[in-house]
Every structure is written in C-alpha cells, then in structure tokens.
C-alpha cells in the first residue's frame, strides 16, 4: 500500500479522483490512503495512479 506524506500534500484532490480503488479520502483536512483498499494499482497500471497525478514529487510513497 501507499501513503501520503501530509506535510507535502497540497490538498489538490487529484489523487482522490484518479484512484481506481477509491482508497483515497479526506480525513481531518488532508488526504489519506486506506491501506486495506490500496492495491498499488497492480494489474491495472504501470505505476500507482496517485504517484502519476500528484503535482508534488515524493508525496505518494510506499507505506
């Protein structure tokens, strides 16, 4: 599963809408990834979609 580095997150929302597993949601003013839903997009995409769309490098990272 992946996680979001909250100190780097700009709360733009790009990742929430791109996640094919609906694993990303807003909690207490920032986005979080539900590890029970995150599949790292294996079998769906070459790399996790949250990583692909996040405008800030190294914000969506392996947990």
Swiss-Prot record:
One of its GO terms (molecular function) is 4 iron, 4 sulfur cluster binding. The keyword Nucleotide-binding does not apply. Its cofactor is [4Fe-4S] cluster. Keywords: 4Fe-4S, Electron transport, Iron, Iron-sulfur, Metal-binding, Repeat, Transport. The keyword ATP-binding does not apply. [4Fe-4S] cluster 2 binds at residues 38, 41, 50, 54. It comes from the Bacteria. This is Ferredoxin-1. The gene is fer1.
